[in-house]
């Protein structure tokens, strides 16, 4: 997989290309990265790529020509069809399902905005999709781009040492992950649940499913509304709800 970022701050991406599982996978050649600085495509000696907005208003707007040239340069680096994504609070929310879809693609180009925004004409002509990481605003698109990259790369075969880690993550199965424990057996008076030390894999699997359902019901009940429950999940969920009704009564 090739991922390119159109950004005026290429160095920010060192954190994801050099460290952690994504950095290791990058060194192993599982995925490649290139930062494309639109300043190199500016039509002025000083490398300006922004100007004042027509109609007035605060801040500066990133101009379409240098961004378009940077995107076209990025596309030319691969024979594979590229998907161009603009990280924007106006985009559709990034979900696990969307990350899984993007992980199947060979070439992503991530457009990182700055200042007050980007000329709308560039978005209409050069961007395939806008994606948001949440209902809030940050100073630029670089951090959202790296969050998207991390979410996508985890799902690319070979990036994680054990793909089961990704399969057990929250949202991968449509519900939240269960609690996890390691040594010591007791910490500040709290012991590791006995079932996890039993060695009975069937009981452990059922406990983990029950805990995932319980946590999802408490923290993200909206996820359960979208989920088609299998009989075991329905039975466990009804038991959990019955317990909650008894506590409230």
Swiss-Prot record:
GO terms for molecular function: tRNA (guanine(37)-N1)-methyltransferase activity. Its EC number is 2.1.1.228. SUPFAM superfamilies: alpha/beta knot. Keywords: Cytoplasm, Methyltransferase, S-adenosyl-L-methionine, Transferase, tRNA processing. The keyword Metal-binding does not apply. GO terms for cellular component: cytosol. One of its GO terms (biological process) is tRNA N1-guanine methylation. It catalyses: guanosine(37) in tRNA + S-adenosyl-L-methionine = N(1)-methylguanosine(37) in tRNA + S-adenosyl-L-homocysteine + H(+). It is found in: Cytoplasm. InterPro entries: Alpha/beta_knot_MTases, tRNA_m1G_MeTrfase_C_sf, tRNA_m1G_MeTrfase_TrmD, tRNA_m1G_MTases_N, tRNA_MeTrfase_TRMD/TRM10. The keyword DNA damage does not apply. It comes from the Bacteria. CDD domains: TrmD-like. S-adenosyl-L-methionine binds at residues 113, 133-138. Coiled coil: none annotated. Its main location: cytoplasm. Homodimer. Belongs to the RNA methyltransferase TrmD family. Specifically methylates guanosine-37 in various tRNAs. This is tRNA (guanine-N(1)-)-methyltransferase. It comes from Neisseria meningitidis serogroup C (strain 053442).
């Amino acid at each position: 997989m090739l991922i390119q970022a159109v950004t005026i701050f290429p160095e920010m991406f060192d954190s994801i290309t050099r460290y952690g599982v994504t950095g290791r996978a990058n060194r192993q050649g599982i995925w490649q990265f290139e930062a494309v600085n639109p300043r190199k495509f500016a039509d002025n000696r000083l490398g300006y790529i922004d100007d004042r907005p027509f109609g007035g208003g605060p801040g500066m707007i990133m101009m379409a020509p240098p961004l378009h040239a940077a995107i076209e340069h990025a596309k030319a680096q691969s024979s594979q069809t590229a998907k161009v994504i603009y990280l924007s609070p106006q985009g559709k929310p990034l979900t696990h399902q969307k990350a899984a879809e993007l992980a199947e693609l060979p070439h992503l180009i991530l457009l990182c905005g700055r200042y007050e925004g980007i000329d709308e004409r560039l978005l209409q002509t050069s961007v395939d999709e806008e994606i948001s990481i949440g209902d809030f605003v940050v100073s630029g698109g670089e951090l959202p781009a790296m969050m998207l990259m991390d979410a996508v790369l985890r799902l690319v075969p070979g990036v994680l040492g054990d793909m089961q880690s990704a399969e057990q993550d929250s949202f991968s199965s449509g519900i939240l992950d269960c609690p996890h424990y390691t040594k010591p057996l007791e910490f500040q008076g709290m012991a590791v649940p006995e079932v996890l030390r039993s060695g009975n894999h069937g009981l452990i699997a059922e406990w983990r499913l029950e805990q995932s359902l319980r946590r999802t019901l408490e923290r993200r009940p909206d996820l359960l509304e979208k989920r088609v429950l299998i009989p075991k999940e329905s039975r466990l969920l009804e038991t959990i709800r019955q317990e909650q009704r008894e506590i409230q009564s």
